[in-house]
Amino acid sequence: MNKKIFLIFLGILFYFGRPLYAAEKMTVLLDWFVNPDHGPIIIAQENGYFNEQGLMVEIIAPADPSAPPKLVAAGQADIAISYQPQLHLQIAEGLPLVRIGTLVATPLNCLLVLEDGPVKTLADLKGRKIGFSVAGVEEALLTGMLTPHGIGLDDIELINVNFSLSPAIMSGQVDAVIGAFRNFELNQMDIEGEKGRCFFLEEEGIPAYDELIYVANPERMNIDQIRRFIKATELATQYIINNPLKSWKIFSGTAKELQNELNELAWADTLPRFALRPAAFDKGRYLEFQNFLKNSGLITMKADISKIAIDVSSD
């Protein structure tokens, strides 16, 4: 009888296949408060994909959006959500960081104007006010977009509106804003009764890039843990694409502040932009954007692409 009970017990363990070891802890720092851009991370947590990969992931929203990459570089967290344009600059500054996966595989940034306003083409921006929130990269993006139209930075007035982008344009403080996310600001304006229109960077001469990426410290990272983390987010992305409404309910059910019209609209607009193969990256695309930054004067030397981005699934 004891032998029979023992065999039944072994059968139950085999059937459920649950690991008998403690999950490995990982800390992930977001770039901002939780929002639809982070869908695969939240769904991986809620659907148990991290747990299936033997990971216990702590997800932290930062008090300072600029801090996460620096904290990862200092070894105080395992992974940070960052931006490809910023990664090139951070590496040029000497921070030990490398892209280990992609969250959002297209630009979200755009140059936003009022649909019924005076700006119909980029050439109409000469002599006008343009709001921004992050100096450096956004100035380079503006230069790249405006130069073909015979406009330089001296021909416009740049105004730091912090992160109050859509209010700045709706109030008339500025004529346009750079740094607006097409999946959020356009929807926010629409909800408030103002129609906006985006000039998309990648359609105006700026090389395409990955808006949101996962970065880690190459000197400290556990490549096996990271590989499993990326696998979990890939499973989550597949679930989201296959179940957009169900995944929205799961995502929005994690916090009351997510349950509003803006986030629901942003969720739908963000889904097509999630990286279906988060581990993979296009070496040529990263090289092209690095060349753009060098030509813009934001970096003085080009780094080997293997020092900027890696495919953890191929290691």
For the regions a language model picked out, list residue spans one by one.
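Conserved C-terminal helix/tail region of periplasmic/extracytoplasmic solute-binding proteins
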Residues: 287-315
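Bacterial N-terminal signal peptides
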Residues: 7-17
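Short, glycine-/small- and polar/acidic-enriched structural segments
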Residues: 25-162, 166-171, 175-183, 198-199, ...
